[in-house]
């Protein structure tokens, strides 16, 4: 029985590692592409990452409530949410970029970043949850 428990833990760790690698790479490429396209004077790349991540976690969260969904079992959740989205989204970058805006004499941009990021992320997670819940139910 101990061997089976070790396998479950190891498979969960592998799911997290693979998801983390893919999520980190996706964040790097998408955030960079958005920043190059829209400019780097405002953290559009980080906002895009966090809003799309919120949308995706809404989808996965809704799917996890459906007993037949693959996201109702541990490893797909560990891969997609703990691994991929854990490395894809970033509160630390959001926080540093907001502080940098404020310290650079742009307090309105800093407040705008907070308001838009939080508002858009809450809207995105709600939309993702409603979309997936509607399709799955």
UniProtKB/Swiss-Prot annotation:
Na(+) is not transported, but it plays an essential structural role and its presence is essential for fluoride channel function. It catalyses: fluoride(in) = fluoride(out). The chain crosses the membrane at residues 3-23, 44-64, 76-96, 111-131. GO terms for biological process: cellular detoxification of fluoride; fluoride transmembrane transport. Keywords: Cell inner membrane, Cell membrane, Ion channel, Ion transport, Membrane, Metal-binding, Sodium, Transmembrane, Transmembrane helix, Transport. GO terms for cellular component: plasma membrane. Pfam families: CRCB (PF02537). It comes from the Bacteria. PANTHER family: FLUORIDE EXPORT PROTEIN 1-RELATED. Fluoride-specific ion channel. Important for reducing fluoride concentration in the cell, thus reducing its toxicity. Belongs to the fluoride channel Fluc/FEX (TC 1.A.43) family. This is Fluoride-specific ion channel FluC 2. It comes from Bradyrhizobium diazoefficiens (strain JCM 10833 / BCRC 13528 / IAM 13628 / NBRC 14792 / USDA 110).
């Amino acid at each position: 029985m101990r061997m089976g428990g070790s396998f479950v833990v190891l498979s969960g760790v592998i799911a997290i590692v693979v998801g983390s690698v893919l999520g980190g790479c996706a964040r790097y490429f998408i955030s960079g592409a958005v920043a190059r396209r829209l400019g780097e004077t405002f953290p559009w790349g980080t906002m895009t990452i966090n809003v799309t991540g919120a949308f995706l976690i809404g989808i996965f969260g809704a799917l996890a409530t459906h007993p037949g969904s693959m996201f109702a079992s541990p490893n797909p959740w560990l891969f997609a949410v703990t691994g991929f989205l854990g490395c894809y989204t970033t509160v630390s970058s959001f926080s540093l970029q907001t502080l940098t805006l404020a310290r650079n004499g742009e307090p309105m941009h800093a407040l705008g970043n907070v308001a838009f990021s939080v508002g858009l992320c809450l809207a995105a997670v709600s939309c993702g949850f409603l979309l997936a819940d509607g399709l799955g139910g």
